[in-house]
Every structure is written in structure tokens, then in C-alpha cells.
């Protein structure tokens, strides 16, 4: 069998009509995750509705509908295997909460696949000032997605078909704005493809014989292997807490950094409650330790369900335990706010699993998004497209960390008027010292 393949997470970004769905499903169709019987069933339905030409996107819509109804076939669907990796496609855009999901999302994407519509008019729409292509690329870069693959899609529909000139024009323009966002375009493969016809997706296409670079599959295989933060102190944000008869209180969450194992003393912040972990399980199997990326249930001693809730963060009591944040300073990019944001603004912050109102206590500086250099001290306000350093104060106890130390607890979405108005990363945190926090009997014995 050899060594098991490494898992990577991919996020697919690009303008709404760029062909993201078709391309994504085509890759999955060819490499993996979909049961052939499911495909046949969908194809038959597509035929009956004369939607054959639309089969891949039709398949994805179908899957989306099943996902929305809560049918759980979806997760295997968005998985595929390359020669080197097991890949999972994270929630692709088009989803209303894409921005929020990408930030508070269950995991950090290791690579962004940017799909560009190469057709006349299509490319221009995607890349225009209000096109989503820029916003998605900026978002990916801000949130620390270091690697990118760019697919020049719909090459079968350029004028003339499979036009080398059109490809070169697009590479030049997209490179210049990816550079503006912060990426190094020389390190990004630009793959001319047809997500619909399948050119250069898995195998080399004779229609594009002027192109000598990697296929999409090759480019995915060339992604640098991600380093998982198991050597850092434990951070495990709680998604939920259950009471299970005969077992007791069972918190559920994803290990973001570090490891958790039976016998460990954990402290839940911001409340400061300390207790011992009795057992850890994933997919109903007991684990001797859980690693970053694992979604686990763990059982804790002498703790009532009411003492725990989603948004709390479990950490190792003896290794840099998490604490309540008094205030923190963040680099914020305003993306979608109709007016001006000034001191005193109080939106909701979605950070890891917590949703808490915070106050923008002080706009410290306005900065250049690309270079990070200061443009203005103590600006009166920030508006769409602006970036700034802001001091924030949570209105309730809250755990956050710096993006540099604990990335999943250091990036956030700012929500207001039911939408994401800004995104940010946390640069520094001033923490409170816990006072008189409760320690369970089991934990007191272990100390």
C-alpha cells in the first residue's frame, strides 16, 4: 500500500459565470468521488430534460439541492484523488455565505484554483472593478492561501477556438492584478482548459498543442505539501456540546492546532473552566490522540452541559492555554459596506466558531492594501476598498489569537446588515488573566 497520501484542501474561486461548477464537477467526475450509479441517474434525468449539454453543472446543482435538503452524499462528492494527494474541494463560491465560510470555514485552503472565463466579454466582466474575481483573489491572499493555480477556462469558445493569442492576453492581464493583490504570478501556473470539453484537465489536449505547461491535474500534483500545526499548543474551538446518557458531557469541535488526548488537562476559555479529558473519538472510534484537522467528540469529567457552549476554545492547561481577550488590533479590509466606518462601529465578528459583537474602538491607521505601508494616521473613517489597522474591544468574553501564531483563530469576517462587510486578520492581542475560574475535582487532583 505504501504511505498514505496527504490530504489537501482546495478552494475554487472566480466570477459567477466562469465555469467553476462545470470544471469542479468534471475533475471530480474523472478522478473520483462520485459513485458511477449516481452519475448515471443524474445523466438520465438530464437527458429527459434535454439538459445534456449542461450535464456537469446540472450534476452540481443537483448535488447542491441534495446538500440543502441535508442529504449527506455531498461530502464524498467533493473529494478526488491525484497521483500525490487526496483532495477535498471546500465550499466553492456562489454560495451566499461563501466569504463567511472561507474565513470561519472548517479549514484553511491549501491552494486556490482561480477559474477565468476566457471568452470575449466573459473575461472582461469577471475582471471588471465590480467583478468577483478580484474580490475572491484578494480574500484568498488576505486569509493566507499562499498557493494558486489559474485556469483559463472556456478555451473551446474563444474566437478563434483555442486561441493562443487570447490565452496570452489573459495571462498578462490576470498576472498584473494578482501581483497587485500580493501574489507572485511567476509562481502561478496558468493552464488553458475547457471544463466542459475536458481539454487539459486530466490529459494533454491536442487542441492546445501550442501550450507546453502542466495540465490541471499536473498543477494540482505540484502543490507544495502543507505543514500541519500539530507541534503548536492545542486550540480546539467548540462547535457544539451534547449530553450523552451513560457517558456525560461531550463537547464537539475541530482540532485547529496541537493535539488532544485522553488524560490531558484542558482549560476552556474565555470562562477558564479546567477539567480532564476522559476519552476522544472520531467517527465513533476511540483515538489515542487527535491531530489538526480532526473533527472530534471528547468526553470531559465533572462538567455540566450548561457550563460549555459553542465559541469556547479548549486548550492544554499546561501549554500556553487560551485566554479571554481584553482587546486586539487587526488589519481589516472593508469589502462591502454602503457607508463609512468610524470609531464606535459595533458589528458582529465571526471568528472560528464564535459570533460576538465587537466595538471598533480606534481606527489607528489607514494602510496600503498591497504593501501594508501606512497612508494616514488616525483616519476619521474607512470605506469600501480601504484597509486599516483597528483596535477592537469585544462586548462579551471572547477568545482570539494572532493570525501569525494560530491562523484559524486569527482571521475573521465582520458581519452587519446580514452580510459580510469586511474581513480581517489579527496582529496582536491583549489578554486578560483568568481570575477565580472553576477547576473540577478531577483536574485539581491532576495538577
Swiss-Prot record:
Cellular localisation: Cytoplasm
Residue numbers carrying 5-glutamyl glycerylphosphorylethanolamine: 289, 362
Main subcellular location: cytoplasm
Region (G4) residue spans: 153-156
Region feature G3, mapped onto this chain: 91-94
GO cellular component: cytoplasm
Protein name: Elongation factor 1-alpha
Amino acid at each position: 500500500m505504501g504511505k498514505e497520501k496527504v490530504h489537501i484542501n482546495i478552494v475554487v474561486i472566480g466570477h459567477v459565470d466562469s465555469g467553476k461548477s462545470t470544471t469542479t464537477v468534471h475533475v471530480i467526475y474523472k478522478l473520483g468521488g462520485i459513485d458511477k450509479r449516481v452519475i448515471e441517474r443524474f445523466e438520465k434525468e438530464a437527458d429527459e430534460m434535454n439538459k445534456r449539454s449542461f450535464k456537469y453543472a446540472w450534476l452540481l446543482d443537483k448535488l447542491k439541492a441534495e446538500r440543502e435538503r441535508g442529504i449527506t452524499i455531498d461530502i464524498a462528492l467533493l473529494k478526488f484523488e491525484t497521483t500525490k494527494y487526496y483532495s477535498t474541494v471546500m465550499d466553492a463560491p456562489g454560495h451566499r455565505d461563501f466569504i463567511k465560510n472561507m474565513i470561519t470555514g472548517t479549514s484553511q485552503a491549501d491552494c486556490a484554483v482561480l477559474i477565468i472565463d476566457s471568452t470575449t466579454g466573459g473575461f472582461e466582466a469577471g475582471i471588471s472593478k465590480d467583478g468577483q474575481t478580484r474580490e475572491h483573489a484578494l480574500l484568498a491572499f488576505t486569509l493566507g492561501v499562499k498557493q494558486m493555480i489559474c485556469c483559463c477556462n472556456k478555451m473551446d469558445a474563444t474566437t478563434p477556438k483555442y486561441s493562443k493569442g487570447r490565452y496570452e492576453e489573459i495571462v498578462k492581464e490576470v498576472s498584473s492584478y494578482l501581483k497587485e493583490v500580493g501574489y507572485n504570478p511567476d509562481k502561478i501556473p496558468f493552464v488553458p482548459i475547457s471544463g466542459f470539453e475536458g481539454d487539459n484537465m486530466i490529459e494533454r489536449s491536442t487542441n492546445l498543442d501550442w501550450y507546453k505547461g502542466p495540465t490541471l491535474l499536473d498543477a494540482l500534483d505540484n502543490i507544495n505539501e502543507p505543514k500541519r500545526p500539530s507541534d503548536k499548543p492545542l486550540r480546539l474551538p467548540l462547535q457544539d456540546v451534547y449530553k450523552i446518557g451513560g457517558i456525560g458531557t461531550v463537547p464537539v469541535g475541530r482540532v485547529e492546532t496541537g493535539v488532544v488526548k485522553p488524560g490531558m488537562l484542558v482549560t476552556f476559555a474565555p470562562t477558564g473552566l479546567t477539567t480532564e479529558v476522559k476519552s476522544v473519538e472520531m467517527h465513533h472510534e476511540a483515538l489515542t490522540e487527535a491531530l489538526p484537522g480532526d473533527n472530534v467528540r471528547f468526553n470531559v469529567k465533572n462538567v455540566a452541559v450548561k457550563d460549555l457552549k459553542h465559541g469556547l476554545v479548549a486548550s492544554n492547561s499546561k501549554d500556553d492555554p487560551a485566554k479571554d481577550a481584553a482587546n486586539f488590533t487587526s488589519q481589516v479590509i472593508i469589502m462591502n459596506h454602503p457607508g463609512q466606518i468610524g470609531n464606535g462601529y459595533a458589528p458582529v465578528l465571526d471568528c472560528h466558531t464564535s459570533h460576538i459583537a465587537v466595538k471598533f474602538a480606534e481606527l489607528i491607521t489607514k494602510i496600503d492594501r498591497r504593501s501594508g505601508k501606512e497612508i494616514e494616521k488616525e483616519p476619521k473613517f474607512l470605506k469600501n476598498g480601504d484597509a486599516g489597522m483597528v483596535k477592537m474591544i469585544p462586548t462579551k468574553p471572547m477568545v482570539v489569537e494572532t493570525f501569525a501564531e494560530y491562523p484559524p483563530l486569527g482571521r475573521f469576517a465582520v458581519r452587519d446588515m446580514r452580510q459580510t462587510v469586511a474581513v480581517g486578520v489579527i496582529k496582536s492581542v491583549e489578554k486578560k488573566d483568568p481570575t477565580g475560574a472553576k477547576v473540577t475535582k478531577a483536574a485539581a487532583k491532576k495538577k
